[in-house]
């Protein structure tokens, strides 16, 4: 349980989990990873895995979380998924699944020990430093249009901050914007 976290701080858990997983994978595979907002783990332009989190709430407090982590470890083919890859395809090395699991669990423990309402600023900075396409002109699609813009960062609530080439700055919740790459 995360008794120190309220619904206002829910994105803190996402930051901690995605950062822990990427840290563990970097140590194992010795390759660079990035985070495609809000929860995909990439190496280059290829998706290696992702994180899903369901928070259990009591009142305004996060009483617990169900965290799902999916990592493509030793897969060799991804039919119909042009952006998918695996640790094996990136490194050429077959990995022991237990070794990957233990490294992730250890990293999660370290990040969870840091979790509090006050930990978001530091975690957010770390998360933004790994944010895929941050600071680069990219093509996006929302419910209305395709447009060019630049990812500027994330808000404390986990919204993606995009500055359109027109200068307009918009904040998007999960599911409301897609990056075309």
Name the predicted role of every residue range.
Residues 33-37:
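General beta-strand structural signal in soluble alpha/beta enzymes
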Residues 1-4:
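Interfacial segments of multi-pass membrane proteins
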Residues 6-8, 12-32, 43-181:
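Long, positively charged amphipathic alpha-helical accessory segments at protein N-termini or as interdomain linkers
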């Amino acid at each position: 349980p995360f008794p120190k976290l309220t619904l206002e701080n829910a994105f803190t858990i996402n930051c901690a989990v995605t950062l822990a997983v990427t840290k563990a994978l970097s140590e194992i595979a010795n390759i660079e990873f990035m985070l495609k907002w809000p929860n995909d783990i990439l190496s280059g332009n290829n998706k290696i895995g992702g994180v899903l989190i369901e928070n259990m709430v009591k009142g305004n407090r996060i009483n617990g979380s169900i965290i799902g982590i999916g990592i493509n470890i030793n897969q060799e083919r991804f039919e119909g998924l042009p952006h998918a890859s695996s640790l094996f395809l990136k490194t050429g090395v077959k990995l022991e699944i237990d070794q990957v699991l233990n490294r992730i669990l250890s990293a999660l423990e370290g990040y969870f020990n840091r979790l509090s309402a006050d930990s978001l600023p530091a975690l957010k900075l770390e998360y933004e430093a790994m944010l895929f396409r941050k600071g680069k002109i990219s093509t996006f699609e929302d419910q209305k249009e395709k447009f060019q813009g630049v990812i500027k960062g994330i808000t404390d609530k986990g919204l993606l901050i995009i500055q359109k080439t027109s200068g307009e700055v918009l904040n998007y919740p999960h599911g409301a914007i897609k990056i075309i790459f």
